[in-house]
Curated annotation (Swiss-Prot):
Residues 127-165 are annotated as: LID. Residues 30-59 are annotated as: NMP. Keywords: ATP-binding, Cytoplasm, Kinase, Metal-binding, Nucleotide biosynthesis, Nucleotide-binding, Transferase, Zinc. It comes from Streptococcus thermophilus (strain ATCC BAA-491 / LMD-9). Consists of three domains, a large central CORE domain and two small peripheral domains, NMPbind and LID, which undergo movements during catalysis. The LID domain closes over the site of phosphoryl transfer upon ATP binding. Assembling and dissambling the active center during each catalytic cycle provides an effective means to prevent ATP hydrolysis. Some bacteria have evolved a zinc-coordinating structure that stabilizes the LID domain. One of its GO terms (molecular function) is adenylate kinase activity. Monomer. It is found in: Cytoplasm. This is Adenylate kinase. GO terms for biological process: AMP salvage.
């Protein structure tokens, strides 16, 4: 079984990916892990990627696509199948993946799309705040301080938000992800591969829906 999992930042994609891998025994292929392994093993594409990273430059698509192809050609993929996580990020990468799968004679069985309302994601992702004195991290909805305005750990009263966690920054980041992701989802929807999963539920309820979708694919 060969799957792709998609979802906006904060949608719980990573949590569901881990559960899928544990339940079904497929190889978890995440972009970060692929890059680290290719560089550590000094593959042709790994050496190329490292040359860009060492210069502080973005790794070009053709190198990223090459690293994905190297990984998908490994023997465990034929034995176990895979869950691809974090790739493709652009429609160009999606088309490159189509070509890679065709070249390797691999069939993509389905795309799990974790859907969460963007406004809910802004709340999830922008609610984090940090104690200035001891660095303890809280969330205004999911993990507030026991006493409002007082750190549970050190009793401090000064808190701050990282720039990345501010609502306007989070919204900008989500807008970019939505703009990049919509054409990819549309592409796979045309191929009849997409299963939409409602992510605004308890983690176990989301996974129950994921399992139903996978059962329908199988």
């Amino acid at each position: 079984m060969n799957l792709l999992i998609m979802g906006l930042p904060g949608a719980g994609k990573g949590t569901q990916a881990a559960k899928i891998v544990e339940e079904f025994g497929v190889a978890h292929i995440s972009t970060g892990d692929m890059f680290r392994a290719a560089i550590a093993n000094q593959t042709e594409m790994g050496r190329l990627a490292k040359s860009f990273i060492d210069k502080g430059e973005l790794v070009p698509d053709e190198v990223t696509n090459g690293i994905v192809k190297e990984r998908l050609a490994e023997s465990d993929i034929a034995e176990k199948g895979f869950l691809l996580d974090g790739y493709p990020r652009t429609i160009e990468q999606a088309h490159a993946l189509d070509e890679t799968l065709k070249a390797l004679d691999i069939k993509l069985d389905g795309v799990i799309n974790i859907e969460v309302n963007p406004e809910s994601l802004v709340e999830r992702l922008s609610g984090r705040f940090i104690c200035r004195s001891c660095g303890s991290t809280y969330h205004k909805v999911f993990n507030p301080t026991k006493v409002e305005g007082t750190c549970d750990v050190c009793g401090g009263h000064e808190f701050f938000q990282r720039e990345d966690d501010k609502p306007e920054t989070v919204k900008r980041r989500l807008d970019v992800n939505i703009a990049q992701g919509e054409p990819i989802i549309a592409h796979y929807r045309e191929l009849g591969l997409v299963s939409d999963i409602q992510g605004n539920q308890d983690i176990d309820d989301v996974f129950a829906d994921v399992k139903k979708a996978i059962a329908a694919i199988k």
